[in-house]
Amino acid sequence: MSNFKKTTVDMSASRTELHDLLDLTGSEVSINNLPAGAKVPFVHIHKKNEEVYGVLAGKGFMNIDGEDIALNAGDWLRVDPSAKRQLRAAEDSAITVLCIQAQAGSLADYSLTDGVIV
């Protein structure tokens, strides 16, 4: 059995979830593409997971608890589990975001304390 797993995804797909493709056990990662003017069709919260959004391309907005946060390529945004959120693309631009979910408060170590040089 290998100690890694690689996959290739269609970067133009509307949504790709990597948990099954990579056998993830500690986080959920998805790639999300919205065309210009489109939005996620629901507002949501999480029971336990915080989310980190990285804007890979384009621009748009994240509505968090009623406040619109402008997003542009290169921006990163962390959202608490209980915050109501909805992503939408700008009227004149598509948006591609990487979303990482992990249980809030579960990070026990960081790169410098968890990594071991071998």
PLM regions and their residue ranges:
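A short, N-terminal "cap"/entry segment at the start of jelly-roll beta-barrel domains
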Residues: M1-S27, A36, A108-V118
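Conserved short histidine dyad/triad with adjacent acidic residue
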Residues: R15, S30-K47
